[in-house]
């Protein structure tokens, strides 16, 4: 990848011998009995070959991402960010980044894409989540995309009949 030609540090990106794609096993991020190998590959594997995975456990990377976000907020007078694939990031790193941004800009909104279809799983990533608190974790994320609601709307508005078990009445 072209970004590897002049890295600021040797560990700026997650690197493996050969290409390693994420296994997309997001539930490993909060399952205390989940496989540590699966959790690491979910967080550290690349999402796709064209998107190198930044090593957010590297303090220099995290500082760069924070400064870059602040620059964009100031330069473009932004009110919020949508963070794609929020739950694939280094869990502690993304929480530090989110807290740094919201501490600096208390009214700034960050919406995290957590593409899961269960409210309990999605709520883990919400700021001050009682579920995440069980593991002493707080993402500091003000808003999480509600894919459970997305799924319901997709079904409701695409069903031909409206009765007790279909469509809007359901």
Predicted feature residues:
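Core domains of carbohydrate- and sulfate-ester-processing enzymes
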Residues: 1-51, 150-170
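Short N-terminal helix-initiation segments at or just after the protein's N-terminus
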Residues: 23-28, 55-56, 128-133
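Short hydrophobic/aromatic-rich motifs at helix boundaries and adjacent loops
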Residues: 39-42, 66-72
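Active-site-proximal helices and loops of the catalytic beta/alpha 8
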Residues: 2-8, 68-70, 74-79, 85-170
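Active-site mouth loops of central-metabolism enzymes
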Residues: 51-64
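Generic alpha-helix detector with strongest preference for long hydrophobic helices that associate
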Residues: 35, 42-46, 50-53, 74-82, ...
């Amino acid at each position: 990848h072209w970004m590897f030609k002049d890295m600021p540090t040797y560990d700026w990106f997650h690197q493996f011998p050969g290409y390693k794609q994420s296994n997309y096993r997001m539930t490993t991020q909060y399952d205390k009995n989940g496989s540590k190998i699966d959790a690491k590959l979910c967080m550290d594997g690349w999402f796709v070959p064209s998107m190198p995975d930044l090593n957010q456990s590297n303090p220099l990377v995290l500082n760069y991402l924070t400064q870059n976000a602040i620059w964009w907020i100031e330069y473009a007078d932004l009110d919020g960010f949508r963070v794609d694939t929020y739950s694939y990031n280094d869990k502690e790193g993304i929480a530090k980044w989110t807290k740094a941004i919201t501490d600096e800009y208390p009214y700034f909104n960050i919406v995290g894409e957590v593409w899961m279809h269960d409210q309990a799983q999605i709520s883990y990533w919400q700021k001050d989540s009682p579920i995440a608190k069980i593991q002493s974790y707080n993402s500091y994320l003000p808003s999480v995309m509600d894919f459970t609601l997305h799924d319901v709307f997709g079904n409701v508005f695409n069903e031909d009949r409206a009765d007790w078990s279909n469509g809007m009445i359901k």
